[in-house]
Amino acid sequence: MKNTSCLLVELHNRGGVKQPANPVKWKEFYVDDIFTISPGKRLTKADMDSGNIPFIGATDSNNGITNWIATPNSSFDRNVLGVNYNGSVVENFYHGYGCVFSDDVKRLHLKSYADNKFVLLFCKVAILQQKVKYTYGYKFNGQRMERQKILLPTDEQDSPDYTYMEQYGKWMMVQMYQYYFDYINLR
């Protein structure tokens, strides 16, 4: 791959990707203060017709996809974080594509920043850090999800530093591409 460095330069130029400085301060925020939380919708196996729309269930694998269905319902969403509150609790996945959510999965959209892959993936990790608290006997239900605190970097106004989160995500992506390109070039 002779043009790998050109591709990395293009990635840097497109998103202004640079290594973000370490945030000065981190702070706890309630999930409910950061996100709008919306429910999925119950859809039984008997009501599912085979199709090409991903159906997101409470699993810890396959990016949450448990089936492929034909018809969307009111839970159809995209560019969203799907968080399990039943089944594999606290597991969560970013869904940049259109999909339908079961009633065991909540949909999270940022309240005060435009949803984007990099910020949502940053928040995914922050939410996953809380997984150890929850078990079958102590479920991650809707109320607990709303009041769960997550640790996020802050800006000068003591608000979540979404710019830092986005830049960090982009920078990590470029680092991984560089790692892959280096591996390919060694072969």
Where do the model's predicted regions map?
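Non-catalytic DNA-recognition/assembly elements of restriction-modification systems
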Residues: 1-42, 46-62, 156-187
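DNA target-recognition domains and sequence-specific DNA-contacting regions of bacterial/archaeal
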Residues: 32-149
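A generic structural motif
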Residues: 111-114, 154-158
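Short linear sequence motif anchored by a di-proline
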Residues: 9-10, 82, 96, 108, ...
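Short leucine-rich amphipathic alpha-helical surface patches
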Residues: 127-131, 149-156, 172, 176
